[in-house]
Structures are given as C-alpha cells and as structure tokens.
Amino acid sequence: MLPAEELAQVKYIPTLPEFVTWIEQKWSDLPCLSDTVNTYTYRQVCDRVARKRALLNSFGLQKGDKVAILDNSTTDAVEMFLAVTSAGYVAINLPAMLPPEAVIGCCMKFGIKVLAVGKPFMEAVKGAPCKVIAITDCADQTAPVATVDKNDPAAIFFTGGTTGAPKGAILPHRALMRGALNGVYAPGHQLGCHRYACVLPLSHVFGLIYSTLSVLYKGASWYSVGNTKDTIGKLPVIKPTMLVAVPGICEILLGLVKMYGKGFLGGELDVIISGAANVPPKLIGEFDELGIHLFGGYGMTEGANLTTGNIDVKTRPTSVGKLYPEQEAKVVDGELWFRGDNVFLGYYGDPEKTAETLTPDGWVKTGDLVRFDEDGFMYIVGRIKNLIILSNGENISPESIEEPFYKDNKLRDCLVKEDEQDGRQVIAIEILPRIEEFGNAPWEEVEAYFKELVGKVNATLPSTHQVSKITVRKEDFKRTGALKVSRNQ
C-alpha cells in the first residue's frame, strides 16, 4: 500500500475529462510520455490531447459516437485515447494484429465514425467505411474537455477469455478510473518517481488501465517500446523501474535475462506487476533471486482489469491477493461475484450475454471458482466453463490438477483436459517444457522426465483426478491475446 503521505495526494476521479485536467495541474512539468527519442511533459501531452479533441470535434461528432484507434502502443495512441474519452466520445482500441477485413468488420459492427491509424497500418485500412485520420493529426487550436457523467460509456474492449468468442465489453468512465486508481496501490513510494516501459498492447485492458492510466495517475513516466518485438532493444535504453506484464511475457524476459544478464532489463527494475493469467510461484521465486519483486493479482475486462492484488507473495505465493478498496465480493455456489464502480455496462449489442453475466443489482458473475482464506486472501480454483464432468457425475477443475505441475522449474506451461483412451474417459495433460533447462539432452530424456513428474503428482491426487495420458509438446500452445494458453487447442 502507498505510504500515508502519498495516499493523501491521490483521490478517486470519476471521469476521463476530469482526469486529464487533474494530471495536467498535478504533474505539469514532470516527464509524461516518451518514445525514447522525444519526451513530453504532462503539460505538453495535455496540450496535444486538447488539439486532438479539437480535431475530433471538427468532424461533427456527437457525444457517445465511437472512435477507433489502430496503432502499436505509441505516445500518439495514448494521446488519442485521452482525446477521444475526454471529448465525450467512446474509444475502441483495435488489436494491432487484426487483418484488414476484420478492421472493416469492426467498423461496421460498432458503427465507428472515425478511425485514427498509425503509419504502419494505413495500407490495411483502405476501404474502411468511416473517416480515416492519421493518429498524429492535431488541430491548430485546442478544445476544452467535455462534460460527461461517470456512468457514460468511455471505451469498448474485446474480451473472450480462453474459451468464448470475442465480445465487446462497454466500460463507463467510473470503471476505467476506479481501475486506474487501483493500479496506484502498489508497495513503496509511487508518485512521480517511476519509469514504465509499456510492453502490453493498449487494446488489452491490462495494457490500457494498469500499464497506462495508472502510470499517469502516479505522475510517472510512460515509455513506448513501439512494436512489442522492439522490447529487447528498448529496455536497456529506458531502464524501467517498474513493468506491467502478463506471465507469458515475464517468462520470455526471464529467459532473456538468463541468456544476456540482468542488464538486459536496464539494471534498475524493481517491481513487475503481472496478471491476466496464472502467475506460477516458481516464476515469482526466480525473479526474486534476481532482486526483482513480482506481484500477481486478479481481474477481468468486465471489472476494469483490477479486482484483487497480492503484495504478500512470499507467504501466499498461490493467492491472487485481497480485494482493492470500494469493491464487494461474494462466493455463490463456488463462483466469484463482485460489484463496485469498476463494473462494466454490458456487452455491445448482446443483451443475452449481458444478462448472463451482469445481474440487475450490479453483480458480475465471473465464471471463476474461488475460495477465500481466513485473512481475506483469494485463491483461484478454476473456471466453471472448464470443468470436466466424470462419468460418475463428479466435477473436476483442470486448473486444480495443473497447479502442482507449475511448481516444477522445467515446465513452462501445461494444459489438462478430458480425453479418451481405449474407449474410456481419461484425464490428459499436454506439457510444454522449458527446453533450455535440459541442455543438449535427447528428446527421450525430456519425455521421461515429465512422465516421472506425472507419476509424482498423481501420487498426491485422488484416483479420479489422476492423469492417464501425457503429451510433451515441441511446439507452443495456441494462445490468447494475453498469451494465456487457449483451452481450444
């Protein structure tokens, strides 16, 4: 938690227009956004945001109209998002990997009026059924922030998790800003003293809220690595003190540190905040050996990314932490329900799915099976949609079987699922090894190692939960945009 003197300096700001005004006044001359070549202060950024607002207003847009953004995680993309939302319009950050036909499809589905595009993507949006502008465009004059209600829609994010088809989750201003404030609550001093390298896409709620809006809330410096592939060359230049990354990226960074040394990360990295997927305790331990604190948490797009955070990882490494302030949670038949300012408005154009997830009195049904310990720390047990139903009627969570496997340092990822063997139902596991841990060992030794590991884990499990079929993969799993292992292999 923040020191008391810093906690007194931050407050809940319910809308993006108020937020943009506040950060300009609060952090005016501190460095705000940088691409490692050019660095802009908060005052300069807010002036550019005001000019982008004026440009958008010149198109005759109405409050609530939708503006899409297609770019890498650049300073211009951040400024355009702030401009769209502080002008009273609704921002949609499109994933940079979308093929041209999907971009056009999104424009049609969401009724997008303006599409702001980064230079690398201009060719891909020819024929878009809306006005297309360069993301760098600004007007000569400025425009004031709009007046909006905290419950007005601010942004739409794609969500689908590891199983379902993508949906458009509508987040109001209050939700974005509650999520952003939750991201300020981190251990140690936070205000005006950190450098963040943005290694996540802004189309992901984790990248936009925790890795961007929370950074600005703190008066910290936000650095673009451009295309994620450029991260390797940028981190030693940026010298970040904090990173926000999904576990898949943390695994990649750890492997590179083992190859090139800690200097690869810039030499000043102290904290990594991770989420959007299970954070294995072994990963926490390996970063701790490097003097880097890795903290996990829990959140979902429908809850503006942040619901719990765990700063007590050494004594509770498998927990996702405690609830952030001003949120309620309850467990209904094993499923986590939560509500608060961070809750979404519904899925765009899908009242049926909205009714399945959001109750009339504001509770989000997460689909996650959880438990709380006596001190209020939450633990993920599994996903309702992932349950394996045995022939005897028993429900098994594959995540509960996967958990002990993740304690092994030679395993990168695994997937437990239902399968068939000799005409009967069995529990199967697919394992992706950390192949670098095996040196030049032949593949047969790798397979033998994990067959032995399965035997050891099976000895700790009830007979109905034991793994009967094992596959050791040479190729990576199919993954989601958050680099989680997809359940649909």
Please state what every model-predicted region is.
Residues 141-158, 165, 189-195:
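Conserved pre-ATP/AMP-binding loop-to-beta segment of ANL
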Residues 340, 346, 369-463:
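AMP-binding/adenylate-forming catalytic core of the ANL superfamily
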Residues 235, 241-245, 253-315, 328:
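Gly/Ser/Thr-rich phosphate-binding loop
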Residues 177-195, 202-263, 268:
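Conserved AMP-binding/adenylation subdomain of ANL enzymes
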Residues 38, 53-98:
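Conserved AMP-binding/adenylate-forming
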Residues 1-40, 44-59, 63:
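N-lobe entry segment of adenylate-forming
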Residues 322-325, 333-357, 377, 392-396:
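Conserved ATP/PPi-binding loop(s) of AMP-dependent carboxylate-activating enzymes
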Residues 41-43, 154-180:
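Conserved AMP-binding A3 loop
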